[in-house]
């Protein structure tokens, strides 16, 4: 995911900024939704202090690049973006996961590759970034600067937003270096989370996407301590948080969608909330593999057989539930039999939405020391075979929806939908899942507006997507 300050320009434009000599900051956000929320915090602070944003590197007094350093492609994209910003502007501050990554000899990788950057920080370092900005572009003094809205500055479209509930992770998966960059789990105070959620709903957000490194573990680090919100006690615990978010969303007719949910036993407690319509019947669960030996080498906290049992329980409790997951093919030591076991799991589990990565060694990951590294061609071939099975399952599930009526959140609607539009059902998270292609309404009076809901009858499928007739 790549976002620039353009996405926030309507919230940040100062009108006659040039005439008042307000400094402008260029901004690029790379990586996952968790990095996006870090970017939003920085942009919110910039706005609070009176800075404006620039739509180009050349037009900025300084550029901030929020980087990703998880896989090699992300590292390359981040380094290339830093280089581009340096070439066009020359004054660059780097933050994010790549900023915490070591290079040769243990030195900072960003400093080694781009020694002229002004400052480098790791992830979730808003204050450090602002301190660096103040050094190189002093804070403007303007008593007439607009106040920042309660929900902060967002890089997403106005009708959906990400809500980060914690930072870091207590797991030590052998293929992952996130804990070394973002640290152990730190849960946000539940009152702060709920206040942010309420402000987002009040601002017009119709879909709230709950994110973290491990949503199921929310509150573990503080022993599920009791917090207070609206004068009432509430535990810092995933199930309590989800229940309150559902209550907040209901009067606004908004959706709550859960991401990065590890399949712990207490996840079963939120299924009745899904079945009752309090939160979306959608779970993003990172299974990664199904064979117990591979999961053991990955140091994952589950096994395939238990996951099949969980999926069966979830579907019994909430038949309409949609499960999304990600998997890794070609992990070191993975035999053909272990990979076939994974394919059998996919066929039996019937995961609605599945993505798969060919294993890619990440510098600093303990998996690099495992025996049995597979050639790239084998890894890619297994990824392709996995996706063929996953796409067949997905296509079958999509066909089952033809003839059904679904609620669709509209993401695009040229000419108020007179030529059709595009939206998503409860089964579709933004950017990672499919969409619903909306046909032109049959009623002349029917209008489609971005950020609003419409009912649609599903009339067909198109690849990973559905085709719907607005009602």
Curated annotation (Swiss-Prot):
It comes from Methylibium petroleiphilum (strain ATCC BAA-1232 / LMG 22953 / PM1). This is Ribosomal protein uS12 methylthiotransferase RimO. [4Fe-4S] cluster 1 binds at residues 32, 68, 97. Residues 23-138 form the MTTase N-terminal domain. Its cofactor is [4Fe-4S] cluster. Keywords: 4Fe-4S, Cytoplasm, Iron, Iron-sulfur, Metal-binding, S-adenosyl-L-methionine, Transferase. It comes from the Bacteria. The gene is rimO. [4Fe-4S] cluster 2 binds at residues 169, 173, 176. Binds 2 [4Fe-4S] clusters. One cluster is coordinated with 3 cysteines and an exchangeable S-adenosyl-L-methionine. SUPFAM superfamilies: Radical SAM enzymes. Its EC number is 2.8.4.4. Its main location: cytoplasm. It is an enzyme of class 2 (transferase). It catalyses: L-aspartate(89)-[ribosomal protein uS12]-hydrogen + (sulfur carrier)-SH + AH2 + 2 S-adenosyl-L-methionine = 3-methylsulfanyl-L-aspartate(89)-[ribosomal protein uS12]-hydrogen + (sulfur carrier)-H + 5'-deoxyadenosine + L-methionine + A + S-adenosyl-L-homocysteine + 2 H(+). Catalyzes the methylthiolation of an aspartic acid residue of ribosomal protein uS12.
């Amino acid at each position: 995911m790549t976002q620039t300050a353009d996405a926030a320009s309507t919230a940040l434009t100062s009108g006659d900024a040039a005439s008042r000599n307000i400094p402008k900051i260029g901004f690029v956000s790379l990586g996952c939704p968790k990095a996006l929320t870090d970017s939003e915090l920085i942009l919110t602070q910039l706005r609070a202090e009176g800075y404006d944003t620039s739509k180009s590197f050349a037009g900025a007094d300084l550029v901030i690049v929020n980087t990703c350093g998880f896989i090699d492609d992300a590292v390359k994209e981040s380094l290339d973006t830093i280089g581009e910003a340096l070439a066009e502007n020359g004054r660059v501050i780097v933050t994010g996961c790549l900023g915490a990554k070591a290079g040769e000899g243990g030195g900072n990788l960003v400093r080694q590759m781009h020694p002229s950057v002004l400052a480098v920080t790791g992830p979730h370092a808003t204050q450090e970034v602002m301190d660096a900005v103040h050094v190189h572009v002093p804070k403007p003094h303007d008593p007439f600067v607009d106040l920042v809205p309660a929900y902060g500055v967002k890089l997403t479209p106005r009708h959906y937003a990400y809500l980060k509930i914690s930072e870091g992770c207590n797991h030590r998966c052998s293929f992952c270096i996130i804990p070394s960059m973002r640290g152990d789990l730190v849960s946000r105070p539940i009152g702060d989370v709920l206040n942010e959620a309420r402000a987002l709903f009040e601002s017009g957000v119709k879909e709230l996407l709950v994110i973290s490194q491990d949503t199921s573990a929310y509150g573990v680090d503080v022993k599920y301590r009791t917090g207070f919100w609206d004068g009432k006690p509430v535990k810092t615990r995933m199930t309590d948080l989800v229940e309150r978010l559902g209550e907040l969303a209901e009067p606004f007719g908004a959706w709550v969608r859960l991401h990065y949910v590890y399949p712990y036993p207490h996840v079963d407690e939120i299924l009745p909330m899904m079945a009752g319509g309090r939160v979306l019947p959608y779970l993003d669960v990172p299974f990664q593999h199904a064979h117990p030996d591979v999961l053991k080498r990955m140091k994952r906290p589950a096994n395939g057989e238990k996951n099949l049992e969980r999926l069966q329980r979830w579907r019994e409790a909430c038949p309409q539930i949609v499960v999304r997951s990600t998997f890794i093919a070609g992990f070191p030591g993975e035999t053909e039999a272990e990979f076939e076991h994974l394919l059998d799991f996919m066929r039996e589990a019937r995961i609605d939405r599945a993505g798969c990565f060919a294993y890619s060694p990440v510098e600093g990951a303990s998996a690099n020391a495992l025996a049995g590294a597979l050639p790239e061609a084998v890894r890619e071939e297994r990824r392709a075979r996995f996706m063929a099975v996953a796409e067949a399952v997905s296509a079958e599930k999509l066909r089952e929806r033809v003839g059904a009526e679904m609620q669709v959140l509209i993401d695009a609607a040229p000419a108020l939908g007179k030529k059709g539009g595009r939206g998503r059902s409860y089964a579709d998270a933004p950017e990672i899942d499919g969409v619903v292609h909306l046909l032109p309404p049959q009623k002349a009076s029917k209008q489609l507006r971005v950020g609003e809901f419409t009912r649609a009858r599903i009339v067909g499928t198109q690849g990973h997507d559905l085709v719907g007739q607005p009602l």
